[in-house]
Each structure stands twice: as structure tokens, then as C-alpha cells.
Design a protein with these regions (language model features):
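N-terminal basic/disordered segments at the start of proteins
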Residues: 1-14
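Alpha/beta enzyme core
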Residues: 14, 19-198, 204-227, 245-246, ...
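Alpha-helix capping and helix-loop boundary segments enriched in small/acidic/polar residues
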Residues: 155, 232-235
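Histidine/acidic-residue-rich catalytic or RNA/ligand-binding cores of hydrolases
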Residues: 210, 235-244
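A short, acidic, flexible beta-alpha connecting loop/helix-capping segment that sits on the rim
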Residues: 229-233, 262
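Extended terminal accessory/targeting regions
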Residues: 265-266
Length: 267
């Protein structure tokens, strides 16, 4: 086993080949949000479920507001510097280094690229160069394949999402985070040689919608989730995590997961 394999095992469970990653990096662009205003409390409550394989977090929050009792994997955000107050959320740049991530104790690094946006070229260059730096240290890179405002309607377009997933892998990402397309997602997975994990995207209306989305993705080859709002903005995030973990690692169907969710809520 080399360093890359060892670190990937901190993110993806060896037994199932899947992963449940909770993303808590939203504040870097969106500021305080319902569910992560008090990030330290949220982390403590969700960590207590013992369901989370890894967290996606920024270096600032990792340093100042992250105290899990367990030992989950850590994926450190290495791109950002664009907010909702600015002209374009896709105008990200590199904000950290592999060396800094390793000093902080991270197991992997994440960088965004925005396919079809005005900043496609620069964010892909940044992703490729970050991949080069990561691989010098045997550190996995999570490629976060974003869209941008002009392409939001393409979040369900299998051809467009497949393009992004493949391009991310071509530029060196070891894991891809992208959107679930509902149709032909198996083709997205088939065209990408590295594990594909789904983002939550906009908040689902109900927890059952979240379970259906995750189950559909898993059935079509997704290797898990990298999800934020649909977890920590749920009315019952701890109960939902138990149900999601059962979908991902115990092959529950939606009915079984929904029953587990209800039992955790009312039990």
C-alpha cells in the first residue's frame, strides 16, 4: 500500500467502496447559513452519529470550529475566494496548498472547476496544477465540478454532467463530485475512470426526496455523496444520516431507509 491508497481509505470505506462525506465548506462563499451558523455545534451533533466517513471543510473552519470526537477523514478545500457579494461565484482561485493541508492533518484536497463558465479555463488549469502538486505527495484530489449561473439548467443534463466528470478526471482528479442527473447517470459514471460522488445541489423539499436521490445515484454507479445542505438543513439531520448511511453502506432500499429514518425520529 502506498500513501495514496492509505489516504483514500480514510475517505472511501474499503468494505463497500463507497463514502458518506458531509460538506461544510459553504460558508466560504455564502456566509453563515441555517444549519452551520454555529459550525462547532453542528459538527459535534453530526459526528456523534458515527455515520460520517469524511468531512469537506475549509482551512479556517478546520482550525477554529472543528472538534469531532471521532476520527473521520478530512478533505481540505484548496480553492475559493469568490462570494455571493461578488460578480461571479465561478471566479475561484487557489487558496491553499497540499503542504498546508498535510500540516493541518488532511487526508485529501478539493478544488473546483466550472465547466462552461467564463472561468472554465482558469479553474481547470488550477485543478490540473493542484492534481500535480497532490500527486507529488500521494494526496487524493477531489474535483468539484461546478456549473455557474449560465449553466444551472444543465445540472440534469447527462451529457453535460458526463463532460464535466470526464474532464475533471482528465485533469487529474482522483474523485469527482458532481450532480445527479436522474436519467442516464450510469453513462456519467461509465465515462469517468475515477469514483463519482454526488452533490446535494439545492435543498430537497423533503428528506424522502433526499433518500430517493441518493438511492437512484447509487443504483447507477455513484460511489457515495459529498452533501451539505440536504443533511444539516434537514429537520432531523442525525436521523437522516442514519438512513443515508444505510443506503450507502448497507444497501438498504428507499422504503427500508425511510422506515429507519422514521424510527430514529420517533424512537
Amino acid at each position: 500500500m502506498n500513501g495514496m491508497e492509505a489516504r483514500l481509505r480514510r475517505i472511501i470505506r474499503k468494505e463497500t467502496g463507497r463514502s458518506l462525506v458531509v460538506a461544510i465548506d459553504h460558508g466560504m462563499a455564502l456566509g453563515p447559513m441555517t444549519g452551520i451558523v454555529d459550525l462547532k455545534t453542528t459538527v459535534t451533533e453530526l459526528d456523534a452519529t458515527n455515520t460520517i466517513d469524511a468531512w469537506l471543510i475549509t482551512k479556517g473552519m478546520y482550525t477554529h470550529a472543528f472538534e469531532p470526537a471521532g476520527k473521520p477523514g478530512i478533505i481540505m478545500r484548496a480553492s475559493g475566494a469568490a462570494t455571493i457579494a461578488g460578480p461571479d461565484l465561478t471566479h475561484e482561485g487557489i487558496t491553499s496548498s497540499v503542504e498546508e493541508a498535510l500540516r493541518l492533518g488532511a487526508d485529501a484536497v478539493a478544488a473546483s472547476a466550472f465547466i462552461g463558465s467564463a472561468f472554465e479555463h482558469q479553474t481547470l488549469v488550477d485543478t490540473a496544477m493542484m492534481a500535480t502538486a497532490c500527486h507529488q505527495w500521494n494526496v487524493p484530489l477531489l474535483g468539484v465540478m461546478g456549473l455557474g449561473k449560465n449553466n444551472e439548467e444543465k445540472a440534469k443534463d447527462p451529457k453535460f454532467i458526463a463532460l464535466g466528470a470526464r474532464v475533471g478526471a482528465e485533469h487529474g482528479a482522483d474523485i469527482i463530485k458532481t450532480y445527479y442527473t436522474e436519467t442516464d447517470f450510469d453513462k456519467v459514471v461509465a465515462g469517468c475512470p475515477v469514483p463519482v460522488m454526488i452533490a446535494g445541489g439545492p435543498k430537497c423539499e423533503t428528506d424522502l426526496d433526499t433518500l430517493n436521490m441518493i438511492h437512484g445515484a447509487l443504483q447507477n454507479g455513484a460511489r457515495g455523496i459529498v452533501m451539505g445542505r440536504n443533511v444539516w438543513q434537514s429537520p432531523h439531520p442525525a436521523a437522516l444520516l442514519a438512513a443515508v448511511e444505510a443506503l450507502i453502506h448497507r444497501n438498504f432500499n428507499v422504503r427500508e431507509a425511510a422506515q429507519l429514518l422514521e424510527s430514529r425520529i420517533h424512537g
